[in-house]
Regions:
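Catalytic-site microenvironment of enzymes
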Residues: 1-178
Length: 178
């Protein structure tokens, strides 16, 4: 027959009916039954040290309340290269890699390349964006493209974000998948 633009998608649907995410996306989310969801967080080094420490403690607290195991790829008061962040995240391989970037944008970024995108990342970005009043945005930057985990970047003044809703969304999306 004729091979068209949607042939690969049609074949995936035949092989894995009722599943919207690719096999690669599904593999990223594998975890043993009953285990906690692991989220690795990177926080851009901005603001004074005390403000950063309070933000880190809040992340840990809200993550634990939502049943999420939090690890950090950053430390208060320290700058890291993107290569070191990517290497660390790929080594611990969390379910989700969450980045907070302080800038003027009001978006939640997920991976979207020329020929592929992260379906789970897009779903997370859409729901988190809705809760925080930010636009979901498909991008292909270094942190989104080179980490093996589902990656999300939350842009804006992150010290003013309601953190509890972020981890509730992540838990909810992953419980829907499993």
């Amino acid at each position: 027959g004729v091979v068209g633009l949607n042939t690969a998608t049609e074949i995936k649907k035949l092989i894995r009916p009722n599943l919207d995410n690719s096999l690669n996306e599904a593999i990223k989310g594998f975890r043993p039954p009953g285990s906690m969801l692991n989220v690795c967080v990177y926080v851009e080094n901005v603001g004074d040290y005390k403000e950063q420490v309070i933000f880190y403690e809040s992340l840990k607290e809200f993550g634990n309340k939502s049943g999420v195991n939090i690890s950090f790829a950053s430390e208060a008061g320290e700058d890291l290269s993107k290569e070191n962040i990517i290497s660390f995240v790929n080594k611990i391989n969390p379910s989700v890699f969450l980045t907070f970037e302080n800038n003027q944008l009001s978006t939640v970024d997920y991976f979207q390349g020329k020929h592929s995108l992260s379906n789970i990342g897009k779903k997370l970005a859409e729901i988190i964006g809705q809760k925080l009043g930010k636009e979901p945005n498909g991008k292909s930057n270094m942190l989104l493209k080179n980490t093996k985990s589902v990656s999300i970047i939350i842009n804006g003044n992150f010290y003013q974000i309601k953190l509890d809703s972020i981890f509730e969304v992540i838990s909810g999306v992953y419980s829907d998948i499993y």
